[in-house]
Swiss-Prot record:
Function: This protein binds free fatty acids and their coenzyme A derivatives, bilirubin, and some other small molecules in the cytoplasm; it may be involved in intracellular lipid transport.
Domain of life: Eukaryota
Keywords: Cytoplasm, Lipid-binding, Phosphoprotein, Transport
Taxonomic path: Eukaryota, Metazoa, Chordata, Craniata, Vertebrata
Entry's Gene Ontology molecular function annotations: lipid binding
Name the record gives this protein: Fatty acid-binding protein, liver
One GO CC term, this protein: cytoplasm
Length: 95
């Protein structure tokens, strides 16, 4: 998290937080439409334009500011891995 510019207090808040995310899928439309440009907000609050690609039937992939984000849906599990160089951040959630 430090590698993407998050200060220590936000890193600690991220470790302590228990959140709920809503994911709604209608065909190839999630909150973004696959393969079209969309604006996303980074963990530092910066808004960036990126393209989200769908790989297979259950994986969303995008790259922004040198970070590769892969979100995979398997049954009731949502796994997200973000990679910056040799640093990998993984989060697993339940639907």
């Amino acid at each position: 998290m430090k590698a993407i510019g998050l200060p220590d207090d936000l890193i600690q808040k991220g470790k302590d937080i228990k959140g709920v995310s809503e994911v709604v899928q209608e065909g190839k439309h999630f909150k973004v439409t696959i393969t079209t440009g969309s604006k996303m907000e980074t963990m530092t609050g910066e808004k960036v334009k990126t393209v989200v690609r769908m790989e297979g039937d259950n994986k969303l992939v995008t790259t922004f500011k040198g970070i590769k984000s892969v979100t995979e849906f398997n049954g009731d599990t949502v796994x997200n891995x973000m990679t910056l160089g040799x640093i990998v951040f993984k989060r697993v959630s339940k639907r």
